[in-house]
A protein has these predicted regions:
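N-terminal signal peptide c-region/cleavage motif recognized by signal peptidases
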Residues: 17-19
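Predominantly extracellular/luminal regions of secreted and cell-surface proteins
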Residues: 22-36
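Acidic, Ser/Thr/Pro-rich low-complexity intrinsically disordered segments
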Residues: 25, 43-121, 128-130
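Bacterial N-terminal signal peptides that target proteins for export
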Residues: 1-12
Length: 130
């Protein structure tokens, strides 16, 4: 009986770990157009809220994506290429995130912003190298 209980506990732990460590699988991203033309977006995030955006970039032109929040909550930023592979992340503590990516090919990139630890107003910026 103890082995069954341990097995069930282990399965539940794995399911919870996957749910926490694999962000935004169910979030439908909003297309914001071309990354070079994007200025910034102010986002109201609830506790444990998340949003996803799509931006298009040109191969070889590095971009930097950042977040900054008004309150000291824990904001995470994840970037995925068009195949769904994670190409960058900043899951450090605090409201500020920063990632740099140099696209290998032209295409859309998905940005997932997740907030933990209380509601926050977050500014999302993207700068493309000239």
């Amino acid at each position: 009986m103890k082995s069954v209980t341990r097995f069930v506990t282990a399965v539940v732990a794995v399911i919870l770990a996957v749910a926490v460590l694999c962000p935004a699988q169910d979030v439908t991203p909003k297309n914001l157009g071309k990354g070079a033309a994007f200025n910034s977006k102010r986002i109201e995030l609830k506790d444990n809220g998340e949003v996803a955006y799509l931006l298009s970039f040109t191969a070889g032109k590095e971009f930097e994506a950042t977040t900054d929040g008004l309150k000291n909550t824990d904001v995470h930023l994840f970037v995925y290429d068009s195949s769904g592979a994670q190409v960058a992340k900043d899951d450090s503590s605090g409201p500020k995130c920063s990632v740099k990516v140099t696209p290998a090919k032209d295409g859309q990139y998905k940005f997932v912003i997740k907030n933990a630890g209380g509601a926050n107003t977050v500014t999302f910026n993207v700068k493309v190298a000239k």
